Every structure is written in C-alpha cells, then in structure tokens.
Amino acid sequence: MSDKAAGETKNGNGATTEPSLNILAQYVKDLSFESPGAPLSLRPREKAPSININVNVNANPLSETDFDVVLTLEAKAVDGKDILFNTELVYGGVFRIQGIPQEHMLPLLFIECPRLLFPFARQIIADATRNGGYPPLMIDPIDFAQMFQQRMAEEQAESAVKS
C-alpha cells in the first residue's frame, strides 16, 4: 500500500508535488483583419452575411513543466461572392503544469488550456471586427473536449491506415 496521495507525484528531489496549472503569460502572436471591400462593404445589408469560423489548437513543450499552447481563430464573413472581412488571431499562453500524471497531459493541454485562453481570444476578435466597422463578432463557446476527441480519432485512423 502506498502512502502517496491520489494526484500527487514525486518531483526530481523526491518531494511530492501537488497538481497545479498556472498561466505564466498570454500573448497575441499574430492578428490580422482585412476588409477588402471597405467602405462599400460597410453599408447595411438585407440579410446577415455567412460567417465561417475555423479553430485550431497546438501545444509545444518549452521545458519539463512549461508549455506553449496556441489557439488559432480564423473568421471570414461573406455576402454572396463578396468577402466582407477576413480576420485571423493566433493567441498563445505559456502554462506551467506540475504534478499531473502523463496520461492526463494531452487532455489538459488541448482542452483545459485553450478553454482558459478562449474568452480573451474571443474578445480580441470581437474588438477587431468592431474596429473594422462591423458589428462585433461574438464567437460561440467552443467544445474543446469534442475537438480533442475528434483529433484523437483522426490520429488513430491515420495510424491504422499506415499500419
């Protein structure tokens, strides 16, 4: 029987480390907003434009405990064949993760970390579209757990094809 508490791990010095997730920094890596048809595209419209949104999450280790998690949001508003605006945000966060078992790291990096970044990224996109002369684009909350499950299923399918 072990006297190690659930969720605690040993650090390199043999001392136990409580599970923790800390945001060390958040930053805009890239932000672009294009309104190719302005000012004509800013006129009132009879119907709402079609808005396509793409979301991507990547994570890279910076050290044994620090990770760079990057959330990419792309939005394009189209009315017929006219592009009203196109915006892209690459928003990152540096996270310090300690005391988390290895089997929980991927879900933490690809679900919890982007969930923490999303409200800030959403506000930046809303401000960019508003500052571009359009109503603020308020992106609906994103189900990062579903995105992660889909990503894992795609990777398993790819590895099965390669085998």
Curated annotation (Swiss-Prot):
InterPro entries of this UniProt entry? Answer: SecB, SecB-like_sf
Localization per Swiss-Prot or TrEMBL: Cytoplasm
Q: Per the UniProt entry, what is one GO biological process?
A: protein transport
Q: Which UniProt keywords apply?
A: Chaperone, Cytoplasm, Protein transport, Translocation, Transport
- Carries keyword Chaperone? yes
UniProt entry tagged with the keyword Transmembrane helix: no
Q: In which domain of life is the source organism classified?
A: Bacteria
Q: Which HAMAP family match?
A: SecB
Q: What name is this protein filed under?
A: Protein-export protein SecB
Give the classification, highest ranks.
Bacteria, Pseudomonadati, Pseudomonadota, Alphaproteobacteria, Hyphomicrobiales
